[in-house]
């Protein structure tokens, strides 16, 4: 086998591989003989079909299969010999089969050589927060509102009430699509409508007709409404006041607390909020570290890896549409290209961090991650056992642990400053509610 390597552009390589034609011919002959022994052809006894008949019937297909096998096998041998690391499947193009040698071309991309830079220039503002009794009180109030009952009230609408309304929206005197509804039920203060709409209903009684003027946000999803001033003609049909459950031991049973009453509920809420806070704090620091790593290191990315990641993201996006996905056109690749490229870049850079620091997933950390995740379930021990019995899930958790360890390694050389933050504000921002 003879091999020549050519750099076509960037990470793309072209291998021209030459294999003795005799090697292929001998393999074809053996394959024809083997097929002749197995073939069942009318007019010939089993195992007695002449090779010439087999060649006439199946020779072309057999030769194509063998050429494919020869190309694949010799490609693997060539990249090992040339110490090349393909980033994707090669395109194999057969050349001439005449003469003494069979020549083919393999075109593919290789992984880039990654040399980490600027790790000392990464800056991280490390948020610190804790769950206070006031935060637990606020969560209990949220739970009370979620379990509220409503009854018709003969008074002006206020925040927390439900209002049934008819409304017609217009811009410059013209109604717009989607701006009209009858008997629309809205909980005031929920933030469901654009700013100013819900507060504009407050203070009015059932039977009143009135107008409110609001401005659509600049980032509103409908392009034709962004930043526009609209007038809504509203009829308030009914006001319903909320009846909130009392905070007592009976209230605690709504959340599976059978012993310890409201004190046990508060302890459980505090534990869950603390777990969510810890996860959000770690995610915030991780995002800053990765942003810094990406900014400090500019590397060439294999198109094959980006395309593969695009397909993963596209599939995930389609799955979120559920049954509707079957009736939808395929989402265009350019919707995901930027995110896919970042994922590939982060993966390559973290891989080098792991390699440089000789990191291996720590068993204790892996089990800690599983235990933390399982604690959110009714029977944590069952979840832990399930994970430990599933190698694919365990490998996923090892990868998460390795990523954590890589981020911690980067933090050792980064510049850190602590900043105290408010629990509610931080969590709202972390979950996109800010």
Swiss-Prot record:
GO cellular component term of the entry, any: cytoplasm
Domain PPIase FKBP-type: 160-245
Compartment(s) of residence: Cytoplasm
Keyword Isomerase among record annotations: yes
Record carries keyword Chaperone: yes
Primary location group: cytoplasm
GO molecular function: peptidyl-prolyl cis-trans isomerase activity; protein folding chaperone; ribosome binding
PROSITE patterns: FKBP_PPIASE
Keywords for the protein's UniProt record, in alphabetical order: Cell cycle, Cell division, Chaperone, Cytoplasm, Isomerase, Rotamase
Catalyzed reactions: [protein]-peptidylproline (omega=180) = [protein]-peptidylproline (omega=0)
EC number: 5.2.1.8
Lineage top rank: taxon: Bacteria
Domain notes: Consists of 3 domains; the N-terminus binds the ribosome, the middle domain has PPIase activity, while the C-terminus has intrinsic chaperone activity on its own.
Role summary: Involved in protein export. Acts as a chaperone by maintaining the newly synthesized protein in an open conformation. Functions as a peptidyl-prolyl cis-trans isomerase.
Assigned protein family: Belongs to the FKBP-type PPIase family. Tig subfamily.
Name used for this protein in its record: Trigger factor
